Amino acid sequence: QLLAGKLTKGGQQTHLMLWKPPQSKGSVVIVHGYLDHTGLYGHLIKQLLERQLTVVCFDLIGHGLSSGEPASIDSFDQYVEQLNLVLEASADLCPAPLHGIGQSTGGAILLKQLFDQDDGRDHRFVSLNLLAPLVQPRKWKIDRWLFKLTRPFRPTMNRVFRENSQDKEFLHFVRHMDPFQPHRLPAAWVSAMAEWVVEIGQYPENPFAINVIQGDQDSTVDWQHNINVLQSKFPNMGLHIIQQAGHHLVNEASGLREEI
């Protein structure tokens, strides 16, 4: 069973899709990465449905079919608010237990939601599975100073399409055929990410046992630094390093996807 629709709050429309197998053993909410959208996550959705899991996926603000300035955000707080809206709207359709999967920025959003819960409620997810989570991008120490110097003169930047997967068909599709791919990147999003880089370093230790899956050929995030930061925050963290895998683990080559 497939359900699709839009949630509206404060003028923001969120495109949401839900897949439900005949017999469900639980549910998964997928949070996609920056510059992605639900349409790129078919491999993962198929695998989860084969495991008899209900699957929820939504397009982030400014991505896919959701509204908002393309690829832009003022604060990662807005992403967390959007995630909470999706969780509330889909709660009655998602059998327990509820799992979270986040790719890159999606992992950062799931982490921020976990850290920001201070109202005494139990965390909604029984597991968080983070694929190449964004804590700090690669070469950030240099790039942040260049960004500060040039931002007053450059509200947007040319996008560089990276070789972030060994799946050549995926890379070709994203670069040449995907109508949802922006070719200019807003400086506002980089500012929001910079705030996140500082913010995650200020959070206290958390007992939640997150599960991190990371490729050792990732050239998008500073993954060694990120692992160190996450291990300092989550002493019960599980870690799986995938040899030869790049950054976009959801769309890696088929052999690597099986391991992931």
Q: What are the language-model segments listed below?
A:
Residues 206, 212-214, 218:
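Short beta-strand/loop motif that positions the catalytic acidic residue
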Residues 1-21:
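N-terminal cap/lid segment of alpha/beta-hydrolase-fold proteins
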Residues 208, 222-231:
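Short alpha-helix in the alpha/beta-hydrolase fold that links the catalytic acid
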Residues 33-36, 216:
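Active-site glycine-rich loops that stabilize anionic/oxyanionic intermediates
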Residues 245-258:
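Catalytic histidine-centered segment of alpha/beta-hydrolase-like enzymes
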Residues 128-138:
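Active-site nucleophile loop of the alpha/beta-hydrolase fold
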Residues 35-38, 64-94:
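Catalytic nucleophile-loop/oxyanion-hole region of alpha/beta-hydrolase
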Residues 38, 45-69:
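Conserved alpha/beta-hydrolase
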